[in-house]
From Swiss-Prot:
Expressed by the venom gland. This is Alpha-like toxin BmK M2. One of its GO terms (molecular function) is sodium channel inhibitor activity. The keyword Protease does not apply. Alpha toxins bind voltage-independently at site-3 of sodium channels (Nav) and inhibit the inactivation of the activated channels, thereby blocking neuronal transmission. This toxin is active against both mammals and insects, and is classified as an alpha-like toxin. Residues 2-64 form the LCN-type CS-alpha/beta domain. The keyword rRNA processing does not apply.
Length: 64
């Protein structure tokens, strides 16, 4: 498990405005919790706590 930005296909973050949206998204994917990281490295994106290793995360490089 790891703490990371959960990624959509093609290495894009889930953009967000509310913590509730990210918490639901992250826990649905097996994480302990999640919140909306505002003005982070990739803009406003969902950050998950203890996300399982099989779930894709945002990595350096382009979002297509």
């Amino acid at each position: 498990v790891r703490d990371a930005y959960i990624a959509k296909p093609h290495n894009c973050v889930y953009e967000c405005a509310r913590n509730e949206y990210c918490n639901n998204l992250c826990t649905k994917n097996g994480a302990k919790s999640g919140y909306c990281q505002w003005s982070g490295k990739y803009g406003n994106g969902c950050w998950c706590i203890e996300l399982p290793d099989n779930v894709p995360i945002r990595v350096p490089g382009k979002c297509h």
